[in-house]
Amino acid sequence: SGVRGEESVAQETGSLLVVIDVGNTNTVFGVYDGDRLVHDVRLSTAAERTADELGALLLPLFARAGLELSAAGGVVVSSVVPPLQAVFDRLAREYFGCEPFFVEPGIRTGMVIRYDSPGEVGADRIVNAVAARELFGSPVVVVDFGTATTFDLINAAGEYAGGIIAPGITISAEALFLHAARLYRVDIRKPAQLIGRNTAGAIQAGIYYGYVGLVDGILERLH
């Protein structure tokens, strides 16, 4: 998490922007002062969690960083979990003091979407594409490692040219553990060597290098 030194920014509350990325596994809250991230908080995404529970969790965490967000300057939400939209709408209104802006499929961002059905492109992928073009120019490829691993291509004209969706590394590993009765869960990390000399090492090598190969292979083909 990034915190802006020891100087409290509570007096500047109205200038602060709260951005919320609601993913399938985690929800990340970021606070921006202008174009600078001053603090962020990561919570697990839980369908049963209410706006009041989120508020009770978040406000003390932000307060510890010197941030009073009961009257934030704005709230922007990108979510891939539609059933939670009402929860974050209420959270923004009652705990951050403003009406939220939801980034949704079909939103006008100034970026041409070269997709058969532009409305199918998820909010997370739209945000990634626009941010990548803004930060790095184009052409550019964005790789997002989440529950799914997505590859999104912005072409030389600055247009969203399409993408690739692959299973995420965690759910890929879980599928292996679930369907292979004699294999057990291991930490997902780079193994000491490519060729495993025990079951744990062999599984780690397969997961790690298999996934590296997937990413490298797709990027090579995109180039």
Q: What is each model feature region?
A:
Residues 1-13:
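Short, basic, low-complexity termini and linkers enriched in Ser/Thr/Gly/Pro
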Residues 14-19, 45, 49, 175-223:
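ATP-binding/phosphotransfer module of carbohydrate and carboxylate kinases, centering on a glycine-rich
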Residues 17-21, 76, 140-144:
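Short glycine-aspartate micro-motif
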Residues 58-74, 219-223:
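Phosphate/pyrophosphate-binding loops at sites that engage ATP/ADP/AMP, CoA/4′-phosphopantetheine
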Residues 69-80, 99-101:
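Short glycine-rich phosphate-binding loop at a beta-alpha junction
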Residues 98-102, 107, 111-179, 209-223:
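Phosphate-binding/catalytic loop of phosphoryl-transfer enzymes
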